[in-house]
């Protein structure tokens, strides 16, 4: 089986349907004896340029190892699902399991925010003791 990186963008009005779509697509892959190495839901993001007069979309990234039949079925599902506005399937040489730069940046921002909040709590606690 080959390794693939799959990114698809969902219409922003259909964002609440994304978990069901992810479940359906992962079931397609695992049903064909494929494995999912990485699954990231990036959420709603600004598009670089308008697509069908839309300026935002809900992004999902999958890194999978699957047979060609499963990938063909996924591409067909993307094509006939009106909620999916764009999709891209790329073959990669090996499985990618580490977090993408998008998720790493989000985690770093969250850690900085938590550190700042803790530092603020320490300062407030120190002021009240005096």
Curated annotation (Swiss-Prot):
Residues 117-130 have a biased composition (Acidic residues). GO terms for molecular function: small ribosomal subunit rRNA binding; structural constituent of ribosome. GO terms for cellular component: cytosolic small ribosomal subunit. Residues 100-130 are annotated as: Disordered. InterPro entries: Ribosomal_bS6, Ribosomal_bS6_CS, Ribosomal_bS6_sf, Ribosomal_S6_plastid/chlpt, Transl_elong_EF1B/ribsomal_bS6. Belongs to the bacterial ribosomal protein bS6 family. Keywords: Ribonucleoprotein, Ribosomal protein, RNA-binding, rRNA-binding. GO terms for biological process: translation. This is Small ribosomal subunit protein bS6. It comes from Pectobacterium atrosepticum (strain SCRI 1043 / ATCC BAA-672). Signal peptide: none annotated. Pfam families: Ribosomal_S6. The keyword rRNA-binding applies.
